[in-house]
Amino acid sequence: MRIITRGEAMRIHQQHPTSRLFPFCTGKYRWHGSTEAYTGREVQDIPGVLAVFAERRKDSFGPYVRLMSVTLN
């Protein structure tokens, strides 16, 4: 499975009324300019996960990336 853009993930989320947004993993990844740096990368294929997208967040240590997923579980 590949990381897609947030817009594509939201379209998938709207097409499946029972889906929800959930963190894909617990890790934080260093921010590299824009989400395009992460779009297209391969991630582990997990049953029930429809899509994975990168989301920019910020804490006291600075900006980071959180991988979020659209799931059916």
State where each predicted segment sits.
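Acidic, low-complexity, intrinsically disordered interaction modules
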Residues: 16-72
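Short intrinsically disordered terminal tails
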Residues: 1-2, 7-11, 70-73
